[in-house]
């Protein structure tokens, strides 16, 4: 089982994750795209990496925005799994 990261570890990791912030026990970022098709294309790109990691983000989709929330439910907080998936998601957003 993954271990919860300490507040200091989370802060240090967020320094390398531009745009991501800690909101309670989760990481969150809102990505903005040209239009709805861009938003949906981004969400579709998330599917395979999330499945491969066995770790699935909570998503909120609006016309040209996708808010991604990451937390590790079984430990009730942020783990390295969340940090790792946040890095992958950030890279997918710049395609």
From Swiss-Prot:
Catalytic reaction equation(s): (4aS,6R)-4a-hydroxy-L-erythro-5,6,7,8-tetrahydrobiopterin = (6R)-L-erythro-6,7-dihydrobiopterin + H2O
Record has Signal as a keyword: no
Regions crossing the membrane: none
Pfam families the UniProt entry points to: Pterin_4a
Gene3D superfamilies named in the record: Transcriptional coactivator/pterin dehydratase
One of the protein's GO biological processes: tetrahydrobiopterin biosynthetic process
Keywords: Lyase
SUPFAM superfamilies per record: PCD-like
Range of residues in the leader sequence: none
Keyword Lyase attached: yes
GO molecular function, one term: 4-alpha-hydroxytetrahydrobiopterin dehydratase activity
Record EC number: 4.2.1.96
Family in the record: Belongs to the pterin-4-alpha-carbinolamine dehydratase family.
Record protein name field: Putative pterin-4-alpha-carbinolamine dehydratase
């Amino acid at each position: 089982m993954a271990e919860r990261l300490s507040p200091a570890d989370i802060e240090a990791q967020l320094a390398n994750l531009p745009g991501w912030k800690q909101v309670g026990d989760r990481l969150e970022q809102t990505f903005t795209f040209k239009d709805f098709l861009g938003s949906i294309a981004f969400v579709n790109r998330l599917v395979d990496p999330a499945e491969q990691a066995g770790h699935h983000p909570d998503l909120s989709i609006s016309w040209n925005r996708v808010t991604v929330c990451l937390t590790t439910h079984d430990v009730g907080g942020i783990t390295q799994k969340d940090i790792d998936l946040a890095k992958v998601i950030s890279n997918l957003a710049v395609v």
